Amino acid sequence: MKIYFDENMPFAKEFFSELCHLNNGIDGEEQGELVPFSGRTLTAAQVADADVLLVRSITQVNEQLLHLNDKISFVGSATIGTDHIDLSYLAKRNITFQSAPGCNAISVAEYVLSALVVLAERYLLTLSSLTVGIVGGGNTGTRLSEKLTALGIQHKICDPLLAEKQKQDKSHPPTDQRHYVPLVDVLACDVISLHVPKVVGGEHPTNKLINAENLALLREDQILISACRGDVIDNHALLALKTAGHGVKIVLDVWQGEPDVLEALIPYTEIATAHIAGYSLEGKARGSEMLYQALCQQLAITPKYQLANFLPSASIPAIEINQDFNQILLNQLVKMVYDVRRDDAIFRQQLFVQGFDSLRKNYPVRREFSAVTVNLSSTTYSDVPHRLGFNKN
């Protein structure tokens, strides 16, 4: 069995090397092989003999890519979105598809939290006094909501699809008991954080959801964070707003037209990064693990490995806290694990030297809060660090 995988999938060799040799030797002809590829430049000829194709979001999987292949049976995307996959084409050919929903949700939520502590320090903001508006109540929005709840930060969630599903839920109490608000309510919050997929058309499109009309509703003192899909914000409308002197503070991890970036917008951002919010080691590796589990199910075999088998220890595996929790301690804890200013500096210095894709491909190892054990020296201290996701003994 030949398994082709994106070269940027962590631990792909560890997870899949044994699977590609299954059923070898039956006819003595085909040899199992695990083949890495560059996701942006993949061609139909390269994958003409693939039995399994494992991609990330930069690879378009459609008839154009697979028309030379008459044997492929499984396509996996080690990412949360599916807008790069022609699902109807795969269904027509009876090709099994699996994505990795929620694999990097924690990573993105921790990116947002790092951005918030950086901006709070920069502008002397008290985080507990802010209200955060979350657009999108799926996996990532939920993880962010959990962390904000742990910090006692008020927040609102806008998700019309989940709101409709909630109304149709006949169970008592409803499975989802969250209160959803209209977009206009979220746009009035002190912080607006976007966590929706790209949806073109339909009843609730998200393509250019934050357009000139909605941008005009923003106040000068607000913070706008986008760590979902680049097309959710109209970048040219945002640039027009900023060049007109509007004071809204911008954090952009995603950009319209990636890997091309609207260069003129960069100086107007507080934090700018190369679509790496979900790029923690755990976040990327969970995608590999989820596809491994799905392929094992497809092959009717029991999974042999899990992510914990491969994750290394963090550079600072454990710390002890001998004070109660406050915003200063939050700042220190978050930055100890992930300081988003590092990625912002690399982006500004290296974007036009290395290129957008190269920044992503060569992204340094970054860990999640769970990689660090926090020991509290007194049982009277708040367990907020643990509720934020830090490990405990």
Swiss-Prot record:
Substrate binds at S57, T79, Y279. The active site is at R229, E258, H275. NAD(+) binds at D159, D253, G278. GO terms for molecular function: 4-phosphoerythronate dehydrogenase activity; NAD binding; protein dimerization activity. Pfam families: 2-Hacid_dh, 2-Hacid_dh_C, DUF3410. GO terms for biological process: pyridoxine biosynthetic process. It comes from the Bacteria. Pathway: Cofactor biosynthesis; pyridoxine 5'-phosphate biosynthesis; pyridoxine 5'-phosphate from D-erythrose 4-phosphate: step 2/5. Its EC number is 1.1.1.290. InterPro entries: D-isomer_2-hydroxyacid_DH, D-isomer_2_OHA_DH_cat_dom, D-isomer_DH_NAD-bd, Erythronate-4-P_DHase, Erythronate-4-P_DHase_dimer, NAD(P)-bd_dom_sf, PdxB_dimer_sf. It catalyses: 4-phospho-D-erythronate + NAD(+) = (R)-3-hydroxy-2-oxo-4-phosphooxybutanoate + NADH + H(+). It is found in: Cytoplasm. SUPFAM superfamilies: Formate/glycerate dehydrogenase catalytic domain-like, NAD(P)-binding Rossmann-fold domains. GO terms for cellular component: cytoplasm. It is an enzyme of class 1 (oxidoreductase). Homodimer. Belongs to the D-isomer specific 2-hydroxyacid dehydrogenase family. PdxB subfamily. This is Erythronate-4-phosphate dehydrogenase. It comes from Colwellia psychrerythraea (strain 34H / ATCC BAA-681) (Vibrio psychroerythus).
